[in-house]
Amino acid sequence: MADRSLEGMALPLEVRARLAELELELSEGDITQKGYEKKRSKLIGAYLPQPPRVDQALPQERRAPVTPSSASRYHRRRSSGSRDERYRSDVHTEAVQAALAKHKERKMAVPMPSKRRSLVVQTSMDAYTPPDTSSGSEDEGSVQGDSQGTPTSSQGSINMEHWISQAIHGSTTSTTSSSSTQSGGSGAAHRLADVMAQTHIENHSAPPDVTTYTSEHSIQVERPQGSTGSRTAPKYGNAELMETGDGVPVSSRVSAKIQQLVNTLKRPKRPPLREFFVDDFEELLEVQQPDPNQPKPEGAQMLAMRGEQLGVVTNWPPSLEAALQRWGTISPKAPCLTTMDTNGKPLYILTYGKLWTRSMKVAYSILHKLGTKQEPMVRPGDRVALVFPNNDPAAFMAAFYGCLLAEVVPVPIEVPLTRKDAGSQQIGFLLGSCGVTVALTSDACHKGLPKSPTGEIPQFKGWPKLLWFVTESKHLSKPPRDWFPHIKDANNDTAYIEYKTCKDGSVLGVTVTRTALLTHCQALTQACGYTEAETIVNVLDFKKDVGLWHGILTSVMNMMHVISIPYSLMKVNPLSWIQKVCQYKAKVACVKSRDMHWALVAHRDQRDINLSSLRMLIVADGANPWSISSCDAFLNVFQSKGLRQEVICPCASSPEALTVAIRRPTDDSNQPPGRGVLSMHGLTYGVIRVDSEEKLSVLTVQDVGLVMPGAIMCSVKPDGVPQLCRTDEIGELCVCAVATGTSYYGLSGMTKNTFEVFPMTSSGAPISEYPFIRTGLLGFVGPGGLVFVVGKMDGLMVVSGRRHNADDIVATALAVEPMKFVYRGRIAVFSVTVLHDERIVIVAEQRPDSTEEDSFQWMSRVLQAIDSIHQVGVYCLALVPANTLPKTPLGGIHLSETKQLFLEGSLHPCNVLMCPHTCVTNLPKPRQKQPEIGPASVMVGNLVSGKRIAQASGRDLGQIEDNDQARKFLFLSEVLQWRAQTTPDHILYTLLNCRGAIANSLTCVQLHKRAEKIAVMLMERGHLQDGDHVALVYPPGIDLIAAFYGCLYAGCVPITVRPPHPQNIATTLPTVKMIVEVSRSACLMTTQLICKLLRSREAAAAVDVRTWPLILDTDDLPKKRPAQICKPCNPDTLAYLDFSVSTTGMLAGVKMSHAATSAFCRSIKLQCELYPSREVAICLDPYCGLGFVLWCLCSVYSGHQSILIPPSELETNPALWLLAVSQYKVRDTFCSYSVMELCTKGLGSQTESLKARGLDLSRVRTCVVVAEERPRIALTQSFSKLFKDLGLHPRAVSTSFGCRVNLAICLQGTSGPDPTTVYVDMRALRHDRVRLVERGSPHSLPLMESGKILPGVRIIIANPETKGPLGDSHLGEIWVHSAHNASGYFTIYGDESLQSDHFNSRLSFGDTQTIWARTGYLGFLRRTELTDANGERHDALYVVGALDEAMELRGMRYHPIDIETSVIRAHKSVTECAVFTWTNLLVVVVELDGSEQEALDLVPLVTNVVLEEHYLIVGVVVVVDIGVIPINSRGEKQRMHLRDGFLADQLDPIYVAYNM
């Protein structure tokens, strides 16, 4: 690794590589320190600023250390000890640094996420930009890198990664999200945008598209053309305000980040992968073509490799118990095991005599002292758990051999520390499946187990009920003289079960028979050359794996002495094992590479170290390719202390195959160990290609020795049929031997796949009649029969057809500077399957003192390093606070639990970086719009195929004969006068207050008289003329109704306006002002209270109060009657104006004529069978649409009584509406979605108490949700389910549908069939097609019929582009022809160019005479098998969504609600969601119901679910507080208001993530 002093130097890559090679030669002892210095100075001399002398050229403290001791050199470089030793490799580190240096040239603009201050983990003074009122006046980091632009930092010059801090636009550390934060200067941002737009990396295929497909007809109707897509570079910063289409000022900070993200994504992407994912009936994409240049195996087919003959030595015992008996009786004083305390002093020496007698006691006690004589708890062959801590091998050994003597099967497991340990549940599953009822443990361990208040050991999560039995001598019974264990020769009974944790976290039990146990000990004895009374130092876990096989089993067979070093001692003194080797002159030591690394870190040139006694240093994790550097470094340092090169013996093992291979201790020191430098690129294709160490992406592997004695080994292809590999191919190593496991306990299917494999030759013939066992290790057999392992099957991640090993990715991440960044090297790498491919996720613990800037820079570097070295993208990189990842019992990271937490959104990261744009290369092809087939061809096609044209109509108004007296009158004002004369005391309206009591009521004559007085007031005080417009600003109630009819009596045109909210004047009053101005109201009528509010100081701050028209307060009315009541001269004149703000933020007023108003009321009267004797409960906002008509008009026309319940009253009493419905025994009721939601959420837990209060909904015949959108099935269904117990019939709940051009098209009446639900394929819908599927099929979307078509209404489905009629079940725009259509827009605020053809369109083919109104909604008609009231087949209308809400992405049409539904399902804490697009990026805003710490959990889950279900990449995820997403009175989301708020940086988000 080049010295630190070289970091600032621009050395060519080959020089750096040569330096790395020199470094390696030095570390391997090939050259001396002096030679190294000489060659090094020669190499870099040319690049030093002052050539005269190397010494002078380097600053004193940076001068290369010239010390004879390579040990201290090693120590100085690696003193941190924080990095995970398993993956330490200086060569690899050098490669990573070189790769990053390469990246320096091509800057990568990664927008830094925004965080709310409360969410920033580490608050350090320089981590924040001080709040500043300027809108980005200072240049916070320009691309040129001017001196003042670089962020200040504690380390002075940031030479190595200076670029990243600049590339992250202006946001050195702007982690807060308040609008006062400085945003990047306009110049810098502009330059950056240009740089990014022109950056050319490698000319490969373009990214999946985020910027290419803009919609062909503008999606946001209210935005002028060219407002988003056409601008090449947005205006940033300073005085210029960036604006959205309708002139909303936008914070340059948010927009700059988005622009930066867009520019970053515009760059050509590296992997030239074809998009290959085919998942739709018509998305026929080319199958991914294999890369023609990918390496393929070319060698001959490998031959199975035989190990040496297992020689039967004459004095080998017939079984392990027999060996114990022999040594226990003939050498009882011989030491068997010495345990150490935490000070390194011998704690206990177990002799063979003691082991024999204690094991006998254990065997007798478990067979005879548990349960009763007649019913013993444990019988021979039963399984028992062994639960012993890592510092008590003696107790474990006695219990283990006790079980063998009793012919009971021990199942060693870890000590459970809490009731909810990581992975503990799976251990419980193993114990349950093994039928374990007894657990053997030690006294100390038993005392340390968690206890309940009564002192009992609680049942651990997922565990069976256990009897805990302590195996200390005082708890054991001495066996009687006549009892003796049954010692027989090894047979095929199970000896013990070793647990194994799988990739998915499940725990399996590998059964090892007594024969296999004995044979394995014999094979190890032969391979390692063990002899009697040798001393062995064991640092490994003695309960499983190499530690168990050498330190507990083989040692007893050979009467060896084991010195056991507990983990707790290693933590305190990492050199302890080396000291014990010296102290006891041990011949063998069993360690892991981390123990060697720790010893190196702690080593301080101790004098008394002498390792010449060691003949074998077994490296248990030698199969991990990254262990080689620890081995090399260890040899380098301790060679001078008597350590010989041939002593280091890596081995490979697996729970299933036990020891797979081990390097033999040779006496020939001239034969160097085998090593190979392999191309990582080749390895990803499973091919062995030898490379040179100069290359960046290479993996250096060491051999793990030869095949075990008595075994045969081969390698087979990792997937599919177990076919033999070629000689230059990587495969899964398989072993055929006696000394292996035999099955997974109780799992015959999995056992067959692993333990009964018959490798095949290329011709398909099996190579042996005996089964082989899969080892789970990936590797190959090299020259000379040496076995090499390159990784594990469990760590394999197959991304886009290439195989990557998790360990390799970890090694690269840990080699990224600063190496100390990852806390104690705690990092987890795994893959998650998203959209039919595996995606790499990296989770790391960050140091407690890391700033946001540090984290972000480190993450950016990791992405680049992995991209360079492995040529693979990282899907998600998450950082969590130190010490928060789930741990395994030995302190490692519990991988499957970490993955589980990530997937369920409970990982709580403090930083997240998602890169879906880089990684996801298998999206379906963007839809290419085909040239439209002409409307005539479509019609002919339908006729030929026998499909009817999609048109339908309600009953004909003219043909219905009923005794409708109101029909005689053309105008509603006349109907009211008639009712006041004929039925003066009939109550028309009853208004309820929040307690459910009657607040007010109106009879026909009272309403008539009040209307007269208001008419007088308008004429006398207001001096209004016939046809003047009057704004009615009233709360929902009776005053509003009276004012409306007063206007009609005076000949004025009323406009109902929602009054401003007293607590929120700033945002609600401007809308009132706008409607009053746009409607050209000459006068404003209201109550005294609101009158004061309109002129208050708060109002003056929000609007110009001087420009209000005349304001009349109707609390004080004149006494006299009008001279005459105005009668309109023509039914087509204006009756009233209906103003409403659409969900796209457009204010539109429609004109309703007197004729249309009367026809509307008549249609509803017929559909709902309304008569004077009926009562209808209405809980709706009375300001627009059907809500206004039901509240103000219908009762006067039909004569029924309306019970009015203002929706705002439900906020204080959610049960008000339903209690009123029950109390008045109402049969028909109308509500809005917001009311239904309020009841569902607010009364969910109160149904029992409501039942007790006598709430009864059994009389309800129709409960209609008034809506202008697709029916919300989930809400209506949960409402029906919830109140079913209170008598509500599910069939009663339905929805209506109306829009601006016709306020009510459908409404479920009293007769006719129930609304039907169909399931359509969501993917087909995106292509504007309807494809009906079965319920529950993938990608199915339920659509409920929007009620029944009203009388007098005709509907046709037309193509919105060609205006041609479409066939049945085809998706198109809903066109409507009806007497109650609105007669046109009065004004549209937001888009003046909205054509009049909305109201008078004609079909381009077919019936070209009828005039239709275009609703702007997509839907389809479907003729059902059901029968209508008139005996004909019923036509159902299904509404899909509004055209102007739909988003066109990748050439497909998406309805926001579908994406939002998926996102809300993604995590329990998401309460609401809204999506919109910005510069063709999809922005998802989610409301978080939980702690702010959960905010970042949502980012990956939201990204995943949208990818999986909609094939879209989310560009920005914004996490906000509850209630931030604006919702209008109809319960619809105001997505465009939200969008403007986001871009103006007004949302105060908790977190904003910019996905890369």
UniProtKB/Swiss-Prot annotation:
<feature type="modified residue" description="Phosphothreonine">
    <location>
        <position position="264"/>
    </location>
</feature>
<feature type="region of interest" description="Disordered">
    <location>
        <begin position="170"/>
        <end position="189"/>
    </location>
</feature>
<dbReference type="InterPro" id="IPR037337">
    <property type="entry name" value="Dip2-like_dom"/>
</dbReference>
<dbReference type="Pfam" id="PF06464">
    <property type="entry name" value="DMAP_binding"/>
</dbReference>
<dbReference type="Pfam" id="PF23024">
    <property type="entry name" value="AMP-dom_DIP2-like"/>
</dbReference>
<dbReference type="Pfam" id="PF00501">
    <property type="entry name" value="AMP-binding"/>
</dbReference>
<feature type="compositionally biased region" description="Polar residues">
    <location>
        <begin position="144"/>
        <end position="157"/>
    </location>
</feature>
<keyword id="KW-0597">Phosphoprotein</keyword>
<feature type="domain" description="DMAP1-binding">
    <location>
        <begin position="7"/>
        <end position="120"/>
    </location>
</feature>
<dbReference type="InterPro" id="IPR000873">
    <property type="entry name" value="AMP-dep_synth/lig_dom"/>
</dbReference>
<dbReference type="InterPro" id="IPR045851">
    <property type="entry name" value="AMP-bd_C_sf"/>
</dbReference>
<comment type="similarity">
    <text>Belongs to the DIP2 family.</text>
</comment>
<protein>
    <recommendedName>
        <fullName>Disco-interacting protein 2 homolog C</fullName>
    </recommendedName>
</protein>
<feature type="compositionally biased region" description="Polar residues">
    <location>
        <begin position="120"/>
        <end position="136"/>
    </location>
</feature>
<feature type="region of interest" description="Disordered">
    <location>
        <begin position="47"/>
        <end position="157"/>
    </location>
</feature>
<feature type="compositionally biased region" description="Basic and acidic residues">
    <location>
        <begin position="81"/>
        <end position="93"/>
    </location>
</feature>
<feature type="compositionally biased region" description="Low complexity">
    <location>
        <begin position="170"/>
        <end position="183"/>
    </location>
</feature>
<dbReference type="InterPro" id="IPR025110">
    <property type="entry name" value="AMP-bd_C"/>
</dbReference>
<dbReference type="InterPro" id="IPR010506">
    <property type="entry name" value="DMAP1-bd"/>
</dbReference>
<dbReference type="InterPro" id="IPR042099">
    <property type="entry name" value="ANL_N_sf"/>
</dbReference>
